């Protein structure tokens, strides 16, 4: 082949020369026209930045004002400090307390977004390296396959390679956002809040990339309401076999371990279980054919230390996110090797990626090293099962759980100083439980097992060096052995067909709402609360969507017939169903479902059209999120993204530590007005949702908030009556009172709960001065909100026809 050389030429003296680049221009134009034909016209904010989302953020903040809850009065960001910001003081840089609290919250959101998005980048690059960029995306029977991506970027990816520019956009924006955290940058709290909202929606894009990649390539269930049931709980593990425990959120490396087990007929000779979201994705791997998984879900982050100290694992393999920082130290005590398979968590372990597997096993067996980093997944797949089989006989009988004699000795050391109770984030009465144990009564310690979040803070302040967590688990051995439940493997997206079938009911209110129970396991009073909440709303015909750690814990409890909620209720997107979308990154499918309602049911243009779709959701789709045990920065990002999308969220009491809420003033009538897009006239609406993000103190209070904030301006009479019925009943059942503002939601007598119509009409007349025609049992005058089922509520003036 001849070698090409560079050169130049001039057309200065040439006549009648035409240079055409029509193939390039024409191709680009053709692609743009095809995209518009498929996806509709491009909206106003494709690939948004902090500047282009600001108008919508500020529209939300005008009603839902930021409320800041700082953890301390100081700022320690730079060497000018620390600066005391109490009493409206400003720091050396000029930032005040509001700005600092907003910056802290924003920092948590971009941290969470970076975590999910880096997960997505790693997973996408890994999967493309195996299957190629041209692998078609397959999410099941849907045309709207990437609603978050389409909404935010205006693009609809067709192949894995199409996801790469999406990730590049997220990464670029994260860099721009992170820069504003630096001292001497943003100075206004409200603009930090706007940037947090952008970080939230970027998080949903990053999560969607992650799950699209793994659902497409790894044989996960695809929009499958009958995904297989999976065993969950510590009691599901057969400790007589070698046991592998995987911890984290990125399943890429674990799939190689499972492949090795299958290829070598080891699936019935050893156990593999997981903690946190890797556990969910292990049970989804190669399960689109609905075969029962052999992998087991052991539990949530709160179970990590409990599982390690049980001595059950023979090898721990970790990837990224929600893994304890002390696993190597805890593992050393029990001769449990730790294998790190992702460079985000390397624990100071030696990198043995390039070494021979036999040599690594020998070094770990002999105690030369406590584990290693292994980034070659082919070797990882071989190393971990072989190591587990080698370590199991060497570790037989090793556990941190005390014997009966050791237990008596340990509890006898307690002097009831109360330091452990003061350190406990759940304020558990550990001293009294240990005092009872001294007398031989272990009931109170056993009771603490489910309430304990496994943080070990109590042990670190104990002057007698009692391993309190191990003492609690010793008392709960029977409960732990019986800890066996069932959870449905993650089904993936909600299909377009399900949206078409349920969209009208949801928008009109005859399906009372969607309750999305997501997030971590930092519960204020044990894991059963999320089960109670889910059961309450399923019995009331709400759609309950779940994911992550909450989905696991919901599956741990059974009714009198021994059935879990996943066995009692179907898994479709329709009223009275519970659908588990999957791991943490599958939360994008829950927000994406709301976008799909607007796009498929209402025919709204999705592409690059953030404000219009979020406005539709806020005014018409009765969806509320619940992150009852939220602890992480990822949870903050997920919730904030939902807020930007018009979806309110209730958090548990610990979440005040996030430092910011978005709460409306329900008494300010000027805040509860929207436009009727038919003609631009002003409409009064009820004060709901009354917040975008807030906290509740108890699960009972949370139930009432969830029901109330499913009410939407678009509800028809039947829908409003159904929603008022549930809200009023829950308030009376759990709080013992009729809601004080129930009357504000009545537009017409047909809105009233049918069984209590006469009673409530009397209250409207005697307590609120409304005029009632008692012969016809009709409201003559009183309501400020007029009922018009054909009204089109919107917060956006530009959507009105006159505009």
Curated annotation (Swiss-Prot):
[4Fe-4S] cluster 2 binds at residues 75, 78, 83, 93. It catalyses: CO + 2 oxidized [2Fe-2S]-[ferredoxin] + H2O = 2 reduced [2Fe-2S]-[ferredoxin] + CO2 + 2 H(+). One of its GO terms (molecular function) is 4 iron, 4 sulfur cluster binding. SUPFAM superfamilies: alpha-helical ferredoxin, Prismane protein-like. InterPro entries: 4Fe4S_Fe-S-bd, 4Fe4S_Fe_S_CS, CdhA, HCP/CODH, Prismane-like_a/b-sand, Prismane-like_sf. [4Fe-4S] cluster 3 binds at residues 414, 417, 420, 462. Keywords: 4Fe-4S, Iron, Iron-sulfur, Metal-binding, Methanogenesis, Nickel, Oxidoreductase, Repeat. Transmembrane segments: none annotated. CO binds at residue 116. Pfam families: Fer4_7 (PF12838), Prismane (PF03063). Pathway: One-carbon metabolism; methanogenesis from acetate. Its cofactor is [4Fe-4S] cluster; [Ni-4Fe-4S] cluster. The keyword Oxidoreductase applies. Belongs to the Ni-containing carbon monoxide dehydrogenase family. Part of the ACDS complex that catalyzes the reversible cleavage of acetyl-CoA, allowing growth on acetate as sole source of carbon and energy. The alpha-epsilon subcomponent functions as a carbon monoxide dehydrogenase. NCBIfam families: cdhA (TIGR00314). This is Acetyl-CoA decarbonylase/synthase complex subunit alpha 2. The gene is cdhA2.
């Amino acid at each position: 082949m001849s070698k090409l050389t560079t050169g130049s030429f001039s057309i200065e003296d040439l006549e009648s020369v035409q240079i055409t680049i029509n193939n390039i221009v024409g191709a680009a134009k053709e692609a743009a026209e095809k995209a518009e034909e498929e996806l509709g016209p491009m909206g106003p904010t494709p690939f948004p930045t902090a500047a282009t989302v600001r108008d919508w953020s500020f529209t939300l903040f005008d009603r839902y004002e930021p409320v800041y809850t700082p953890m301390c009065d100081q700022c320690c960001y730079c060497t000018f400090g620390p600066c005391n910001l109490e009493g409206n003081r400003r720091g050396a840089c000029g930032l005040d307390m509001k700005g600092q609290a907003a910056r802290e919250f924003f920092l948590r959101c971009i941290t969470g977004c970076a975590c999910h998005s880096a997960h997505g980048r790693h997973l996408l690059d890994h999967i493309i390296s195996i299957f190629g960029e041209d692998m078609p995306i397959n999410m099941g029977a849907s045309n709207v396959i990437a609603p978050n991506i389409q909404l935010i970027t205006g693009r609809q990816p067709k192949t894995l390679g199409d996801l790469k520019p999406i990730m590049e956009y997220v990464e670029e924006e994260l860099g721009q956002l992170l820069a504003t955290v630096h001292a001497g940058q943003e100075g206004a709290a409200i603009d930090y809040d706007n940037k947090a909202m952008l970080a939230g929606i970027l998080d949903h894009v990053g999560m969607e990339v992650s799950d699209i990649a793994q659902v497409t390539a790894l044989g996960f269930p695809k929009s499958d309401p009958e995904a297989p049931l999976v065993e969950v709980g510590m009691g599901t593990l057969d400790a007589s076999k070698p046991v592998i425990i995987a911890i984290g959120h990125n399943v890429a490396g674990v799939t190689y371990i499972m492949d090795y087990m299958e290829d070598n007929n080891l699936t019935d000779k050893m156990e593999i279980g997981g903690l946190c979201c890797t556990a969910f994705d292990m049970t989804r791997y190669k399960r689109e054919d609905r075969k029962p998984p052999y992998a087991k879900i052991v539990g949530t982050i709160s179970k990590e230390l409990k599982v390690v100290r049980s001595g059950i694992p023979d090898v721990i393999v970790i990837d990224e996110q929600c893994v304890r920082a002390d696993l190597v130290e805890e593992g050393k005590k029990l001769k449990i090797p730790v294998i790190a398979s992702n460079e985000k968590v390397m624990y100071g372990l030696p990198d043995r990626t390039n070494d021979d597997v036999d040599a690594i096993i020998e070094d770990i067996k002999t105690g030369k090293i406590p584990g290693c980093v292994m980034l070659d997944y082919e070797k990882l797949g071989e190393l971990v099962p072989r190591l587990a089989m080698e370590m199991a006989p060497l570790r037989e009988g090793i556990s941190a759980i005390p014997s009966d004699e050791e237990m008596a000795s340990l509890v006898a050391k307690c002097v009831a100083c109360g330091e452990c109770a003061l350190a406990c984030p759940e304020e558990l009465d550990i001293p009294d439980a240990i005092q009872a144990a001294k007398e031989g009564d272990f009931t109170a310690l056993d009771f603490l097992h489910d309430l304990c979040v496994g943080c070990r803070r109590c042990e670190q302040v104990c002057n007698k060096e009692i391993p309190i967590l191990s003492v609690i688990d010793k008392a709960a051995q029977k409960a732990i052995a019986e800890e066996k439940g069932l959870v449905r493997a993650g089904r993936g997206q909600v299909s377009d067909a399900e949206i078409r079938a349920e969209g009208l009911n949801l928008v009109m209110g005859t399906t009372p709402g969607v309750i999305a129970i997501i997030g971590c396991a930092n519960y204020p009073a044990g894991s059963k609360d999320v089960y109670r909440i889910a059961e309450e709303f399923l019995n009331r015909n709400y759609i309950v969507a779940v994911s992550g750690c909450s989905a696991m814990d919901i599956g741990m409890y059974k009714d009198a017939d021994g059935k879990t909620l996943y066995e009692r209720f179907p898994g479709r997107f329709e009223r009275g169903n519970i659908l588990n979308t999957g791991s943490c990154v599958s939360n994008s499918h829950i927000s994406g479902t709301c976008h799909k309602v607007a796009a498929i049911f209402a025919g709204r243009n999705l592409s690059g059209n953030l404000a219009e779709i979020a406005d539709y959701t806020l005014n018409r789709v009765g969806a509320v999120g619940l992150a009852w045990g939220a602890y992480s920065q990822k949870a903050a990002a997920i919730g904030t993204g939902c807020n930007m999308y018009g979806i309110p969220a209730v958090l548990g009491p610990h979440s005040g530590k996030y430092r910011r809420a978005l709460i409306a003033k329900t008494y300010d009538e000027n805040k509860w007005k929207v436009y009727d897009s038919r003609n631009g006239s002003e409409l009064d609406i009820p004060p709901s949702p009354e917040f975008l993000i807030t906290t509740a103190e108890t699960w009972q209070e949370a139930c009432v908030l969830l029901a109330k904030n499913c009410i939407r301006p678009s509800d028809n009479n039947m829908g409003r009556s159904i929603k008022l019925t549930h809200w009023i009943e829950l308030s009376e059942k759990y709080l013992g009172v009729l809601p004080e503002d129930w009357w504000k939601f009545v537009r017409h007598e047909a809105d009233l709960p049918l069984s209590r119509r006469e009673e409530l009409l009397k209250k409207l007349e005697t307590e609120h001065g409304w005029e009632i025609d008692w012969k016809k049992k009709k409201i003559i005058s009183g309501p400020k909100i007029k009922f018009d089922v054909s009204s089109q509520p919107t917060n956006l003036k530009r959507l009105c026809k006159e505009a």
